[in-house]
Amino acid sequence: MILLGSSGSIGKNVAFLAMKYGIKLDALACKTDYKELNSQISKFNPKFVYIEDNKLKNLVEHSRVFTSKDGIDKFLEACYDEFGSTVVINSLVGFSGLRPSLVSQKLGFKLALANKESLVAGGKFLDTKSINPIDSEHFGLKFLLKNRPAVKKMIITASGGAFYDMHINELEFVTAKSALKHPNWSMGAKITIDSATMANKLFEVLEAYHLYGIKDIDAFIERTSCIHALISFMDGSTTAHISRTDMKLAIAHAIGLEEKEILEPIDILSLKNISFNTINLKKYPIFTLKKDVLNNPDLGVIINAANEEMVYKFLNNEISFLDINRAVFKSLDKFGSVKIDDEDTVFEIDKKVREFCKGF
């Protein structure tokens, strides 16, 4: 198995399960955290490792280290030459995860995908039917689809993020520090901000479309985050996927551990305050784009690039929280008519949108 993004939250959970169940990690890749990478090297003895930052190469305790100077394509090609068609877990953060997803499928790897930007920006160029999704909502949908009648509607849930109980007028002045306090999940900084703006849920709607080919997809607020997904079927029945807020379950199913005891089941008697609410579109304006992205999934490239660029500006205290959405809508005004017919155009538009957003 090849693990991309080994030092992140998902990557560490994959490593935990691999260690617990004796699964070999043949190759590891991360961005800059060489200390965590070295720790994983000592535990798993991988054949190849990759660290994005070339300046850190000499700090990695391994004889076969690839960096951005070589390119992650070369790293994956070396892995394929050595291991053949194995599983690639892509848990990289951001748009940088798209190219490894494309390359992995072209080489013939089985793709287990936690990198949502791969689908948001490049879903039309991926074989989505062969992807194992590592995301609580999409894993929940996949689980519910097994041996079921025709689907009428899919529903995913959102916690509402860090600012759900805050008045709209207060959002202009919130800080990155306060935005990172997610009520239920422990996640990386970028996805936690996306949860607070509801960009994460917009992306997950588009991911669900690419994965399952259904446009009748909605999202509702469910504050406990224990109900991850629901499906309404043509026969009038609705099923829900309920589990603890722990990504190990989705990971386990993606790597063949579905028969193992991964999590303690939720105590059903403890579920006393479950309720669903619609998403407040005034408070979360980015979610007004749901119909637009389902009708024109190419818009995902623009929204993702603008959002990603502005989230990091917000985390660096360069802009206000509400500037994230403002930049997304202005980027759509400027680039929204673009047609994307090939992979190269995805990367070209991404670059242009980021340059445009640097002016904010």
From Swiss-Prot:
Single Gene Ontology BP annotation: isopentenyl diphosphate biosynthetic process, methylerythritol 4-phosphate pathway involved in terpenoid biosynthetic process
Sites where the protein binds 1-deoxy-D-xylulose 5-phosphate: 116, 136-137, 159, 182, 195, 200-201, 204
Cofactor or coenzyme needed: Mg(2+); Mn(2+)
Reactions performed catalytically: 2-C-methyl-D-erythritol 4-phosphate + NADP(+) = 1-deoxy-D-xylulose 5-phosphate + NADPH + H(+)
Its biological purpose: Catalyzes the NADPH-dependent rearrangement and reduction of 1-deoxy-D-xylulose-5-phosphate (DXP) to 2-C-methyl-D-erythritol 4-phosphate (MEP).
Family the entry assigns: Belongs to the DXR family.
HAMAP family xrefs: DXP_reductoisom
PANTHER family linked to this entry: 1-DEOXY-D-XYLULOSE 5-PHOSPHATE REDUCTOISOMERASE, 1-DEOXY-D-XYLULOSE 5-PHOSPHATE REDUCTOISOMERASE, CHLOROPLASTIC
Record's protein name: 1-deoxy-D-xylulose 5-phosphate reductoisomerase
Gene expressing this chain: dxr
